[in-house]
Amino acid sequence: MESMINGYEVIEEINKGAFCDSYKVRKGGTNYFLKAYKDPTSMSEDYEQFKQNQRTMIPLLKSIGGQVETIVEDFEVKGLYYQVKEFITGATNLRDWLNDNDNYDERLDVAIQFCEILKAIHGKNIVHQDLKPEQVMVVKDSSKKAGVKIILTDFDWSVPNGNVVRIVGTPGYGNIDGTNLSYKSDIFTFGIILCELLAGVNPFVITEKEEDRIFEPEKWKEWVTEKDYVLPIKINDDLPKSVNDIIVACLEPEQSKRPTLDEIMGVLQGKPAPDRLYPRKKAKLRAPSGDVMIMVPGTGYGRKHFKELFGRTTDTESNPVYKYLDKNYAVLSVVQEGEDILLGCPANGFAKNKIKLNGIEMSSKPTMVKNGDKISIFSTGKGTDIVNFTIEVI
């Protein structure tokens, strides 16, 4: 990079990427953020559409104001395209803010702000297409309930007026709609981020390590349509039911079944989830082999981001269901409240762990359990109990 670009002095390199590099630059005593889009030959005719899309969006984004990044100007030098943006001082990204803040009310306020931003860009006929926490800047603002305001950035692959250049997405936040992009595509990804904001977990990720991902959102539609599998109807016991339900609805594979931003906003502000989002399909129970990961109340066993791993969910009739899951979220066995409460191991057993009921190893035959029964997860490899808990049906 040259020391001067179109009158901007390059101060430091911030990031180098496959498609663009970014720099802190200065002009007239003011600092700016410069993006240099490189290697246009790899895009051929797409590059011209990319530039046209960007130039269409710049005035639209400026008209939205402080909720989105400000693009000061764009220009070309030696065949390469550049954008100059406001340099946001004292900002962190949403990922880092979440890691340092577990206050639900403040996270809820940020979720409401995010919803307002999406309403604003959709109102300008823009689909963002690449939403993720790293694209959201967080700055202090005492006028907000959370004490911060958020600014949505990085509209490189956003779609104005339906003019798609490329289908893109980040692992864990990808697009499941293919070329059928619409505002509801952003709703799906927003649902993932809402789950992180309000439930403390990405529904498609066990840990943040790439190799530990359960499956990508791009495969989600296949899971639902071919395997009749759905997310746990209850994500987190601490979530208000309406918030839980609206998050799950955002992740519907079919666009038409996802809620509108107005419906999401209503729920975040205290209204019940709309009736039209129901009924949902009930997941089929499967019992694959593999290490058991039992959901246990009040522990952080086995997963970094869960407060509790023995999850009380509900079925389509709102009856309590306790599901035992392996590390890939496949259901191994189930405890259902009714006249009898049955607990069973899968017929093929577990690879390394067994379940004990009141000290006796369980077979695949369902056994009635009751409040006060002692459950142990026993490691056959280590010869010790991994975790112990007591059945409590509410």
PLM features: residue spans?
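Conserved catalytic-loop aspartate of Hanks-type protein kinases
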Residues: 186
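Forkhead-associated
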Residues: 293-380
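Activation segment signature within eukaryotic-like protein kinase domains
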Residues: 110-111
